[in-house]
UniProtKB/Swiss-Prot annotation:
One of its GO terms (molecular function) is FMN binding. It comes from Salmonella dublin (strain CT_02021853). NCBIfam families: nrdI. Probably involved in ribonucleotide reductase function. It holds the Pfam family Flavodoxin_NdrI. This is Protein NrdI. Belongs to the NrdI family.
Length: 136
């Protein structure tokens, strides 16, 4: 299986989800001066910001990470978290990234996710990488 890369704000909701998921993952640093480079294909797990609109939905740290062409070339899919209070725009960072990077939006979950979300993502990530490797 290939990598997961994620960002979590200081609320740690996405981080807690990733810990419960229990799959190998790399965290995009909170400190915008710290940078990481990913050398293998990955699925990005990202929270949505901004109270429900598309403007400001993608965290700055994620934008900076994806503006590195090396990292952007390796993204294969996106999973988004958000808050259902945002209505139709909950998890919209996933939509923004999927459109801009030309990758599928694979799943969305609320806040730190439920056990059902954990099970769905584990299964879905495994199936996604298997399908991708068969089509390569």
């Amino acid at each position: 299986m290939s990598a997961l890369v994620y960002f979590s704000s200081s609320s740690e909701n996405t981080h807690r989800f990733m810990q419960r998921l229990g799959l190998p993952a790399t965290r995009i640093p909170l400190n915008e001066r710290e940078r990481i480079r990913v050398d293998e294909p990955y699925i990005l797990v990202v929270p949505s910001y901004g109270g429900g609109g598309m403007a400001g939905a993608v965290p700055r740290q994620v934008i900076r990470f994806l503006n590195d062409e090396h990292n952007r070339a390796r993204i294969r899919g996106v999973i988004a978290s958000g808050n259902r209070n945002f209505g139709d725009a909950w998890g919209c960072a996933g939509d923004v990234i999927a459109q801009k990077c030309g990758v599928p939006w694979l799943y969305r979950f609320e806040l730190m996710g439920t056990q059902r979300d954990i099970d769905n993502v584990r299964k879905g990530v495994n199936e996604f990488w298997q399908q991708l490797s068969r089509s390569a």
